[in-house]
């Protein structure tokens, strides 16, 4: 057993429904086999367990590991393709790079960079958009297993309106998806996600095949994109006889508590009602929404309809792996949206980056650092004299220190990361 000594910040109680930031200065967390067995003032935990090893994390702040609910593994080398809206950006930047995943050696190199980037950003769990090629998804799961990340991913499928080399058929999509799920779902920390790219690029037959895979893989998730860009939404309405976007998935039984839909920048009230009633979650991807000019996310309307919301980096339309940056951009977005904006404080941002993500991904064992949870955590320790170190040192209280972390922090300030109490990154 190990006692971690430090200052711990987390959000076990949802700040959108009255919870506040939990702050425990000089606390002790007793961890055995990756699980937090006791938590209290360091002195008390030490007295009760005098013989255990101590890992001293003083001089920094310990947060739960981040949960990234939407990130594309084959797009890391496409980050920074600025200046285009979604459909043009896909054609110009994202899809040519995704086509390179046909070469499994190339995909393996990208997968290694991808898992390192996530871990370095303090992200311990992620719902990852895979590749259109089964072998590339296979190397992603292998790379994630080596590092030990908690990954949910799957084969991305499409059968129309993308470049030819990325298309599949409903039969092949079903067979390849099921084979990958049988190989990886529930193995180590890996889980499978059924992943049609978006209904723009998927026929009803393909979405029906996705539903069959979801049914045949208990505990799998469903993920896709929704209501991101006006031109995309108009095309989807044309293709599906004027339907609201969420219903293009819902009519196939793909929208429920297992579902995580990315973006939802321009939902109708009917879309929000269905998402709220079914318990589906939305991955809010604020830097991507700004970079592609997709729009300002209507958070207040999501909250009104009881829709679960968490954060996604959406690399490569998003601008990097750090959920600190996504939190700050989420805050900016609400400031800019006008009367409808929800004023986010630092507890909201931490919740969106941690516990909300764990909830969206169906991972009740992570998201905060309570007794009974797994020790998935990160130590933020900025370099001495850096603007963040100065800001944290002179903060009046922990909420203010946390706001400064979201404002000034980057992956460079993440000093160490643990999953199940195993040290990943230093
Ligand atoms: N919609 C369909 N594919 C994509 C993608 O790769 N990125 C984003 N942001 N939206 C999408
Ligand atoms: Zn995306």
Q: What residue spans do the PLM features occupy?
A:
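N-terminal metal-binding scaffold of metallo-dependent hydrolase/deaminase domains
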Residues: 1-48
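C-terminal cap of metal-dependent C-N hydrolases
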Residues: 15-17, 374-426
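Active-site gating loops and adjacent loop-to-helix segments of metal-dependent hydrolytic enzymes
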Residues: 77-107, 155, 160-170, 230-258, ...
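Alpha-helical scaffold segments that flank or form the walls of functional sites
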Residues: 81-149, 173-186
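Metal-coordinating catalytic core of metallo-dependent amide/deamination hydrolases
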Residues: 135-264
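Histidine/acidic-residue-rich catalytic or RNA/ligand-binding cores of hydrolases
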Residues: 230-242, 271-276, 293-302, 319-335, ...
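His/Asp/Glu-enriched, well-ordered alpha-helical/loop segment
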Residues: 251-258, 300-389
């Amino acid at each position: 057993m190990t006692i971690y000594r430090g200052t711990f910040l987390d959000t076990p109680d949802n700040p959108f429904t009255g919870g506040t930031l939990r702050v425990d200065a000089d606390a002790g967390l007793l961890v055995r086999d990756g699980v937090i067995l006791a938590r209290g003032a360091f002195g008390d935990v030490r007295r009760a367990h005098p013989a255990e090893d101590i890992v001293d994390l003083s001089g920094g702040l310990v947060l739960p590991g981040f949960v990234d609910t939407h990130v594309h593994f084959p797009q890391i080398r496409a980050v920074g393709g600025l200046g285009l809206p979604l459909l043009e950006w896909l054609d110009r930047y994202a899809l040519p790079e995704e086509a390179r995943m046909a070469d499994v050696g190339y995909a393996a190199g990208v997968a290694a960079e991808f898992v390192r980037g996530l871990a370095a950003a303090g992200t311990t769990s992620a719902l990852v958009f895979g590749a259109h090629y089964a072998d590339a998804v296979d190397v992603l799961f292998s790379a994630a297993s080596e590092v030990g990340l908690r990954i949910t991913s799957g084969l991305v499928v499409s059968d129309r309106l993308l470049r030819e080399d990325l298309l599949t058929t409903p039969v092949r999509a079903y067979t390849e998806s099921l084979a990958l799920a049988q190989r990886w779902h529930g193995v180590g920390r890996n889980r499978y996600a059924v992943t049609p790219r978006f209904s723009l690029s998927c026929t009803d037959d393909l979405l029906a095949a996705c539903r069959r895979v979801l049914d045949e893989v208990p505990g799998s998730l469903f993920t896709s994109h929704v209501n991101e860009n006006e031109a995309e939404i108009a095309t989807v309405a044309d293709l599906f006889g004027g339907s609201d976007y969420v219903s293009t998935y819902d009519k196939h039984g793909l929208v429920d508590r297992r579902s995580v839909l990315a973006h939802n920048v321009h939902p109708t009230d009917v879309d929000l009602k269905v998402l709220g009633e079914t318990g589906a979650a939305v991955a809010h991807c604020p830097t991507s929404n700004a970079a592609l000019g997709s729009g300002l996310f209507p958070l207040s309307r999501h909250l009104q309809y009881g829709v679960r919301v968490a954060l996604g980096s959406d690399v490569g339309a998003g601008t990097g792996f750090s959920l600190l940056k996504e939190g700050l951009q989420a805050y900016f977005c609400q400031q800019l949206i006008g009367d409808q904006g929800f004023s986010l404080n630092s507890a909201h941002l931490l919740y969106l980056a941690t516990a909300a993500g764990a909830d969206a991904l169906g991972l009740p064992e992570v998201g905060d650092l309570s007794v009974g949870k797994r020790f998935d955590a990160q130590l933020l320790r900025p370099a001495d004299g850096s603007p963040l170190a100065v800001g944290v040192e002179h903060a009046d209280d922990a909420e203010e220190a946390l706001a400064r972390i979201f404002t000034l922090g980057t992956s460079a300030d993440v000093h160490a990361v643990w999953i199940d109490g195993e040290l990943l990154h230093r």
